Swiss-Prot record:
DNA binds at R292, R311, R316. This is Holliday junction branch migration complex subunit RuvB. SUPFAM superfamilies: P-loop containing nucleoside triphosphate hydrolases, Winged helix' DNA-binding domain. PANTHER family: HOLLIDAY JUNCTION BRANCH MIGRATION COMPLEX SUBUNIT RUVB, PTHR42848. It comes from Erythrobacter litoralis (strain HTCC2594). Its EC number is 3.6.4.-. Residues 183-253 are annotated as: Small ATPAse domain (RuvB-S). GO terms for molecular function: ATP binding; ATP hydrolysis activity; four-way junction DNA binding; four-way junction helicase activity. Pfam families: AAA_lid_4, RuvB_C, RuvB_N.
Amino acid sequence: MTDPIPLHTPDRQPEDPDVALRPKSLAEFVGQAAAKDNLAVFIEAARSRGEAMDHTLFFGPPGLGKTTLAQIIARELGVGFRATSGPVIAKAGDLAALLTNLEPHDVLFIDEIHRLNPVVEEVLYPAMEDRALDLIIGEGPAARSVRIDLPPFTLIGATTRQGLLTTPLRDRFGIPVRLNFYTEEELEKVVTRGAGLMGLAIDAAGAREIARRSRGTPRVAGRLLRRVRDFAEVQKAGTVTSPIADAALTRLEVDGLGLDAMDRRYLTMIADIYKGGPVGVETLAAGLAEPRDTIEDVVEPYLIQLGLVARTARGRCLNDRGWEHLERQPPAGSQTGLFDGKS
């Protein structure tokens, strides 16, 4: 049986009231400075020429603002915004219905674009390149090909698994944008802004404490902020301070690095059962009773970013920092130092 959805997961959850906290413009958007500066140029250039902006691909870990940036692009271009996701577009007719209902220069956002049906993807190619749909009408000897012209539009794709995109699809995006984990300083700004929108009093130390445990991810920061607010309100605390945030997050089993019970189970399994590794991801997924995708997309990226774990050709290994976080010594003969640049 799998555990309930952990508080730290960067995946969007149905109950997340993210909409009210989302920035409405590039000026309000915190972090991703290089991507933001480049997007501002592309938006202004498209607007000044009266053209649709080039097709754009956002890739990177979940929860970093891909959907929000897509909405901001549409808003700053002054055009319509349609959103869907790869798994929802089951057949070519679904895609045709979306594309033929677009107004000139509209933005079509496809989340999880790496999960598009291959048949649908083939139909998308001429739509992106030639602004046309090539559809087969009828069956058997009576079947005929029909080309439907489309208005100029901007396709924005988002993926957490860029490597799963086919080369023909990836190459059709003129603007590839990688989104990276946020710094603590950037997340502190996200928390402070979110608290202000909630009408929650928070001091700098309290915001910093939440930011420090947010896994470099704004979506996680927003979720932790809402849970800290719950504790603060019940305790009748006028202002969220560092001790209040620390006490709330400790009760939620989110440690000083932002790791929770799932992360610690992952690290402990590698340490205790496999003596620090290497161990394959399929073995870890089976031992944790979690899908492989959850391990690779949710658990591992931040642990690797922190230098706690190394992903090698032979499997996953604990680094020295991983052993230190578990407050243990690596066993004699372990391969720990090989992946830290230490002997």
